[in-house]
């Protein structure tokens, strides 16, 4: 994968730093992780568009589908933020921002949900079966499910 060397390159930037020190990936490095990929969740998925940084997501819990549409950004302080407005048959929500921070530590990428989530392994070098990043698929692999959920929500019945 093209990104596998980014963690190592970033670790090399801090040549004189302690082995335990963490560095922050650039906005470009963070964007490589997400652009044109689908993040598979237990009960849905989110697609991070490449051009214009569009974002769409869907969930289906206990027979109740929800879809979210908006944008995503990568920041220079190592964050990926999702600005999504969720809707279902029962509600139409306001746009909300959810951010995840990233850091590179020991050649591995860690992630946490902001503002105060626990750091966990996101992408290790070499890859590990427990990595969260293994839930990402190249391309828009769940577009059909998103469209199906949208039609269900928008139907009058």
Describe every region a protein language model picked out:
Residues 1-4:
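Bacterial N-terminal signal peptides
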Residues 7-69, 75-157:
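Lipid interaction determinants
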